[in-house]
Each structure stands twice: as structure tokens, then as C-alpha cells.
Amino acid sequence: GLRALGVPEQYGGLSIDTVTTAIIVEELGRGDPGFTNSLTNNRKVSAYLAQFAPQHLQDEWFPRYMEDPTFLMANCNTEPRGASDRALQYNAPEAGLQTRARYEDGHWILNGRKQFISNGYLAKLFVVYANTNSSVGMLDGTSTFLVPRGTPGFTVERANEKIGRRFCINGEMVFEDCRLPEDHLLVRDKAMKKRGGYGISGKIAESAQAVGVAQGAFDATASYAREHFQGGARIIQHQVVAARLANMATKLETMR
């Protein structure tokens, strides 16, 4: 189903291209952007694992994901101090990721905190961005790790209250000497640079969702204008209202 958009076909997934994903996300965005956001985050992490995870980890986790309809995944980048501070290319102590990872005795040890992570409060599998080389800038010194829920030293602390997209519950993650096997390293350094099509695809999906939300708002507005009367005529028959609706429709098509 829709949860399988980014899962490879050999695991029963759809492995759908970016354009088709955008069409699906736009339609879903008309109804509930929170549901759509949760869905696109699953798709984003699935596509990332398909591209970067070792084969044995894909063999372990994709079947679990496909068999469990409650299985959510999350992409952990945003932090309390720096937000999604991945655009800064200079190396300064106050800039970039504060979550650190060091290699020790055949394991990776993570320490830090993430917040506002979509799907985070309920997710069972996380892709975590961490600083592994403080001597270079963020684009060259960031690595990604696969962290299952329940890993010792990893805590999902709380859910954040939101005024919108409430179906997609975000959360805060804490890493306190979180110990990961060596093979749970997905991308060693330069993880930001290697996002490639995965990152672009995610942005396209978010944009398509916004178009869907706008289309839903336009549909509701046009329906109201057709059904309600003012000044002895349907609202849509007033020239200024019709002109505004036409302008909205034009902008929607331009966005699409």
C-alpha cells in the first residue's frame, strides 16, 4: 500500500518514482497534511535505506516494516540549538550538528539530542545524523547511522504539541552513550553531500503536499461560494469573488 512507496520491489514494496510519488502526495494533501507528512517521512527513510544501508540490514528491516502496519520510520536531523543547521558550510563550535559519534572498540557511540522529529514519538527505526569529524565543516564531517528503537542509551523523551499536522506526531530523541554495532553506520562523513536525489525527492514531495493543501482550500472556497447567497445572488456570481477565485486557480496550476 501507500506505506511501501519507497521500499524496493524485492521486499514487496512499490519503489515508485518521484513524479508518481508527487501525484499521490498532492492528492492526499488535499485531505490531511498530517497523514501525508507521516507517509512521506516513511517514504524518505525507506528510500535512504534502499540507497545506503548494507544488504543485510535491508534484509532485516524491510520485511519487518512491510509486515507491521504500525511500523513508522523517522529521519533525525533537527536539533535544539541548531535546528536543521545543515546549510552552514563553515566550521564553528556553535554551528552545525551537536550530536556526536565516536568509534570505540568496534562500536559507534552516539551522544546528543534531536527534536521536532516527524514520526519520532512513535517510530521504530531512525536514521540519525551525527558529527563524526569536528575538524572539517558540516558538509564533510557528518555521518548517518541506523538506530532501532530500544537501543541502550537511546530514549524517545516526549512528543511535541503542535497546532497543525497533528496526525504526524513528532518527538525528541536523547542519545546518552548510545552504543551501535559498527555495521549500523550508513554513510561515513560527507553524508550531507551524498543526500543527492534522496534529498531532492523529499523536497519535491513536500512541495506537492503544499499544492494539495492549497487545492483543498480552493475546493472548499469555491464550494462555499457556489452554495451561499449574498445581495440576492450566489457569492460566486459577484465579479470580484469570481475574479479572485480565477486568480487562485491560475496560481494553483502554476504551482503544479
Annotate the PLM regions.
Residues G1, P8, I24, P54, ...:
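Buried hydrophobic positions in well-ordered alpha/beta secondary-structure cores of metabolic enzymes
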Residues L2-L72, N119-L125, V211:
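Internal helix-loop-helix
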Residues R30, T155-T254:
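Glycine-rich beta->alpha junctions and the first turn(s) of the following alpha-helix
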Residues P69-S84:
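A short, Trp-centered hydrophobic/proline-enriched beta-strand micro-motif
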Residues G82-S84, P93, L97, W108:
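Hydrophobic, small-residue-rich alpha-helical packing segments that form membrane-like cores
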Residues L88-A92, F116-N119, S135-V136, K162-I169:
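Short Gly/Pro-enriched turn/cap motifs at secondary-structure boundaries
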Residues T99-R102:
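A structural signal for short hydrophobic beta-strand segments in well-ordered beta-sheet cores
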Residues N111-T155:
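A short core secondary-structure module
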